[in-house]
Amino acid sequence: MIKHLAEALRFLTILPIPGKPALSEQALVRSMVAFPLAGTLIGGLVAATWFGATWLWGTTTGSLCAILTWGAITSGLHLDGIADSADALFSWRSRERKLEIMKDSRIGTMGAIALISILLLKWLFVLGCGDLAWRALIVAPTLGRWVDIIGIFWFPPAAEGGLGRTFHDHTRRSDFWWATSCAGLVAAGLLWWWAGLIFAVVIVATIIIARWMVRSLGGLTGDTYGALCEIAEMLVLAVVAALVNHQVL
């Protein structure tokens, strides 16, 4: 598991992880079982930033610093995905044209709106989490990377070749359930029985959005995995903020 976790961190972050990178796509696929734990470590660094920046400058600036650190650690990997996905999905063009738009490195109007919206919502929801923000900041990236596995395992890839197809074809059912168990333990350990509600919201939203993406694109792509991850992270923060606002958490 340590080997898989190290490979997952190399793939998902810019952190300097000791050791040699994977020499094959299959080795990278095997690391997917550790994606949720990689998300937990990402969340730990983000939560530490929140603690430090909040102590120095208050919750507003602390929450903003946490969001910026979050994006920096991952090199905007999933943020790029939600921007590209928005440009393609809301172009209302043919399926082939949407896939072409998704490959374009330039960001369009809908992509910019989606990117700004997700960052702004995350920031506001972190503020709304109050003293429990650090817990939410750990759980959110954990479930976000778990949602990537849902997209890869349960939904078809849009392209016949590429890394997405390799991930889909070589992911085992046991990998999915192991990753699910890890994500569940982290969420339950930090948010107690409310983790069940958060899981339910994230799963339902992921299934609805992923099915829409499949109908629109013929399958999922690397960019749509990123979009699903970002949306899931935002939903975790949103649910925790709502529970705190109504004084039930």
From Swiss-Prot:
Q: How does it sit in the membrane?
A: Multi-pass membrane protein
The reaction(s) catalysed by this protein are: alpha-ribazole + adenosylcob(III)inamide-GDP = adenosylcob(III)alamin + GMP + H(+); alpha-ribazole 5'-phosphate + adenosylcob(III)inamide-GDP = adenosylcob(III)alamin 5'-phosphate + GMP + H(+)
Q: Which domain of life is it from?
A: Bacteria
InterPro entries, sorted: CobS (IPR003805)
Which molecular-function annotations from GO does this UniProt entry contain? adenosylcobinamide-GDP ribazoletransferase activity; cobalamin 5'-phosphate synthase activity
GO CC annotations, alphabetized: plasma membrane
> Which EC number(s) are documented for this chain?
2.7.8.26
What is its biological role? Joins adenosylcobinamide-GDP and alpha-ribazole to generate adenosylcobalamin (Ado-cobalamin). Also synthesizes adenosylcobalamin 5'-phosphate from adenosylcobinamide-GDP and alpha-ribazole 5'-phosphate.
- Protein name in the entry: Adenosylcobinamide-GDP ribazoletransferase
Natural source organism: Herpetosiphon aurantiacus (strain ATCC 23779 / DSM 785 / 114-95)
What would be the name of the gene that encodes this protein?
cobS
